[in-house]
Amino acid sequence: MKTEIICVGTELLVGDIVNTNAQYISAKFTNIGIDLYYQTTVGDNYGRLKECLENAFKRVDLVITTGGLGPTVDDITKEVVADYFGEELEVIERYYDLIVKKYNERGFGEVASGGRKESSILKNSKLLENEVGLAPGFFYEKDNKKIIVLPGPPREMTWMVDNQVLPLLKQYSNDVLLMKTLEIKGVPEGRIDDRLKDYFEMSNPTVAPYAKEGCVHVRIAMKGDRGSSDYLTAEIDKIADEIKEIYPQAMEIKEDC
């Protein structure tokens, strides 16, 4: 399943905040064998966001968006998605009740008009619960186009990816991607590239070098269905052993996602 991430927010484009959402989603999707092909960042602009959706669905099957689900006028993601698919929005009343409760607890008085907007999702979509925030997400599918819409705050996004999105996507993908990384010190990247060229031209498994400060990481990855994990592991180990024979100083390391 070809996938694109669209991160929405002018604050991302002007450098006010670092886009950690794309990194987190990419790592999690890789672990379950979802093919991530593109990442796009767009500001809070209706026309440009709609154009991003149009372009994305010309080249991928699944789009996941983060950001733009709040109560203010520049939070436009849900409206643009509704426009693109020709659907309406509907309020999830229990999420609106949460907003009312928050206002009352903080003595803010009557809920602002954007409260109902924040608590809405696309009609005919699957609700994605948000247990650490006020804006729900949703999953929508039409004409073989799938979209997952998530809030932008990293704390909310990460909880929803782990507890809502990954279990959902595992229904659509039986693939798994296994990886092993070797660290090689004392050899320039260019020389490693020459020596391991035949490995780097492989397709599955894939072998790729990544220059790090003072060393080079060589990542071996192989994709297959979940029932073939033992086979995948054996193939990866075989290549790792071959590379260790060429570079005895190569050490296996764990890279955090």
Listing of model-derived features with the role each one plays in the protein:
Residues 8-10, 65-73, 151-152, 223:
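Glycine-rich beta-strand-to-loop/alpha-helix junction loops that act as flexible
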Residues 48-51, 58, 76-172:
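Proline/glycine-rich low-complexity loops and linkers
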Residues 54-65:
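Short, structured active-site "lid" loops
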Residues 140-221, 231-236, 240, 246:
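Accessory alpha-helical/coil subdomains and C-terminal extensions
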